A protein has these predicted regions:
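Alpha-helical cap/lid subdomain in secreted, periplasmic
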Residues: 1-106, 110, 114-132
Length: 132
């Protein structure tokens, strides 16, 4: 963890790693009596080498480390969506994002939701029975 002083308030704040926050989320969900499923981040609309960029060496790695440690179900939305965007193609995928490379349009959000449904079915989640 790191301690930072906030510019406006001058108060100090402790900031933990991404993995720490994932584990905290999992713990909080279990404490509420629910069953967590980790879902990775959506891919960015960046296309080095003709394919949508995968971030499996940073966020993807951190998700997998937490999943290995906690044995929580993991839906790899990042790669499921990136694979489908590769098939759609770089030019057409521009319609799925707003003006930046991170935030999707409504069309992109709907596409990502379909990818979540596909992932839930593939992992044989109990939630899959509620999907079309």
């Amino acid at each position: 963890c790191n301690v930072y002083q906030m510019q406006e308030s001058k108060q100090f704040e402790v900031v933990y790693s991404f993995g720490w926050y994932l584990k905290k989320f999992i713990q909080d969900v279990y404490e509420k009596g629910a069953h967590p499923i980790l879902v990775s981040l959506t891919p960015r609309n960046e296309w080095p080498h003709g394919k949508m960029e995968r971030r499996n060496d940073t966020y993807g790695k951190w998700y997998r480390e937490v999943v290995a440690e906690t044995e929580v179900p993991f839906l790899d939305l990042h790669n499921i969506a990136a694979d489908s965007y590769d098939k759609i193609g770089k030019e057409k995928v521009k319609e799925y994002y707003k003006k930046d490379h991170t935030h999707t349009s409504l069309k992109g959000a709907r596409h990502n939701a379909k990818c979540v449904a596909k992932g839930l079915k593939k992992m044989k989640s109990p939630l899959a029975k509620y999907l079309k």
